[in-house]
Amino acid sequence: MAHVLILHGFTSHPILTLGPLPEVLRRAGYSVSQPTLPGHGTRPEDLVGVRWEDWYRVALEAYRSLPEPRALVTLSMGALLGAKLAAEEGTSAFVAMVPALGFVNPLAPLAPYLRWVVPTFKGTNAVRDPQRKKNNPNYPYFPTSAFVEVLKLRRQIPPLLPRITAPALVLQAQHDSTIPQAAVRRYYELLGSSSKEYKVYDSEHDLLLDAKADEVAQDVNAWLKRVLPPTQSP
């Protein structure tokens, strides 16, 4: 059986923001693991004092616990952690949804300095569909100090991407108000994979919460089944 590790994003609810994807993959026959990264799934204040190394430690432990063959399916900040895992641990298939290699907010690069005077940032309700927007489970705000850790992690990723050679799928949101489209494209172009695909959806940043969530989940499942069938053995 093939195993899939799903990594959620920064401020994301570890279960709810993954939408239909985990269940779609399970029904297809994959073994699915979806760890909760430290500081998530509770309240924004629990991100205070959490370092990027803490997120990576949890992701690494969860990944190493999975038998091969194994795939990485990642979202936003999770695509930074996933890239580090894929480059350093290897993987059979790699999916990166709206990877957080840059940020639309012009204040984002200033977070290391702003944290002393601006303790929190407002979260982005990155869902276009009005009804789904009302039920967004992500944190409404987050500690600036925690975002600084995201920036520290992000700086490490560009040199790692050429080391990833597994089949890769990168998904972009056409109306993303969080991650610039150019940053997602750069992530894709830096990947060392000889077999890689790039898809764009009529969606906001939260691909698995917005109106295209079902389509995204089905597309990820179909792609995985091509490159790593659920019944594949080591």
Where are these predicted regions, by residue range?
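Short, surface-exposed "cap/lid" segments of acyl-processing enzymes
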Residues: 1-43
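Gly/Ala-rich beta-loop-alpha elbow adjacent to hydrolase catalytic centers
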Residues: 74-82
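Active-site nucleophile loop of the alpha/beta-hydrolase fold
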Residues: 95-105
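Active-site nucleophile elbow and catalytic-triad environment of alpha/beta-hydrolase enzymes
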Residues: 143-160
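Short beta-strand/loop motif that positions the catalytic acidic residue
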Residues: 164, 170-172, 176
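Short alpha-helix in the alpha/beta-hydrolase fold that links the catalytic acid
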Residues: 166, 180-189
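Acidic catalytic loop of the alpha/beta-hydrolase fold
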Residues: 175-179, 206
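Catalytic histidine-centered segment of alpha/beta-hydrolase-like enzymes
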Residues: 203-214
